[in-house]
Amino acid sequence: MFLKNLSLTNYRNYETMSLSFDGPIQLFIGNNAQGKTNALESIYVLALAKSHRTPRDKELISWDADYATIRSDVLRRYGSVRLELQLTTKGKRAKINGMEQQKLSAYVGALNVVMFAPEDLSIVKGAPAQRRRFIDMEIGQVSPTYLYYLSNYNKVLAQRNQLLKDLAMKKSNSLEMLAIWNTQLADLAVKLLRKRFEFIRKLETWAQEIHTGITDGRERLSLHYVNSSPVTEEMTIDQAVDKMLAAYEEVRDREIMRGSTLIGPHRDDFSLKVNNMDVQTYGSQGQQRTSALSIKLAEIELIKEEVGEYPVLLLDDVLSELDEHRQTLLLETIQDRVQTFVSTTGVEGLKHQVLQQASRFYVREGKISGER
């Protein structure tokens, strides 16, 4: 897929901005706090209807405006698609070819992106919540049903947690209602888990191959899903639901005491190991960075496998930080197949091959010029 253009209105420090793109690499050059990261972020938001930097849409809207709009014409293998996302303080409006989508889950996936930013090291060394968010965002790009299940799971989870609090405070004694929530939550949990198991397995296959190449065969990367429940990938759906229901019963008293659901996808994690060593805890910064790069490059291949075409790649202030070997591997992965947007403070440290292929955009105080 290929972004033919990008138009922003009232997005962060861009009052208005309109660009056209040609060629495989788009290079955004500027000092810090000028808006180059905002430009890349807007593409991510257009694709996923949420930012990787903040959960608050209000921060994406210019301080003196009531709304922000992102538009782009995206070339897919089946033709051109016009995407438009409007952000307001009250919600989002998403359009595909001028038709408003009633649910964001029907919109997400029209454009697939992979973002690699300095904060993506949190995939390796951050908190479990950051890795859960990574899983949810990446599966959601290629599976609208996953987003639907996740949304429903979170709604039922909130209702169940409220009932557990009421039971703890003696405001309710309805164990029958708890059983109803258990049944609904178990069914949704199993649907999410089956998708997550499959995702981690496929991601590991690609990441292992890439990591082995980066390290010249010295290291083997493995990913392991850390499950808070007794559900396993080998179980049938019925077996998994029964296991989840039994697990809820087993921890019921503790959950009532704490007023919170203690097991399920919202408590899960995944671990990364290099040569059977926990890279999150014991890995060097170099090993953690290489593991993160391997996962990001694996995402590119996994999306291609799932949707039949390569995603757009967003490299936010990371390309110049990669040594020549890692830059070479990245370039070999993308070649002319992956449209890539790069933000950087300067061209020093970038391979000549990158500069040869790149269209350059100079960013200063929310204005972009110097396209060539």
Curated annotation (Swiss-Prot):
GO molecular function: ATP binding; single-stranded DNA binding
Signal peptide location: none
GO annotation, cellular component aspect: cytoplasm
Matching CDD domains: ABC_RecF (cd03242)
Domain of life: Bacteria
GO biological process: DNA replication; DNA synthesis involved in DNA repair; double-strand break repair; SOS response
PROSITE patterns registered for this protein in UniProt: RECF_1, RECF_2
Subcellular localization: Cytoplasm
SUPFAM superfamilies the UniProt entry points to: P-loop containing nucleoside triphosphate hydrolases (SSF52540)
Binding site for ATP: G30, N31, N32, A33, Q34, G35, K36, T37
UniProtKB keywords: ATP-binding, Cytoplasm, DNA damage, DNA repair, DNA replication, DNA-binding, Nucleotide-binding, SOS response
Entry's family note: Belongs to the RecF family.
NCBIfam families linked: recf
Job description of the protein: The RecF protein is involved in DNA metabolism; it is required for DNA replication and normal SOS inducibility. RecF binds preferentially to single-stranded, linear DNA. It also seems to bind ATP.
PANTHER family attached to this UniProt entry: DNA REPLICATION AND REPAIR PROTEIN RECF (PTHR32182:SF0)
Protein name per the record: DNA replication and repair protein RecF
Organism: Brevibacillus brevis (strain 47 / JCM 6285 / NBRC 100599)
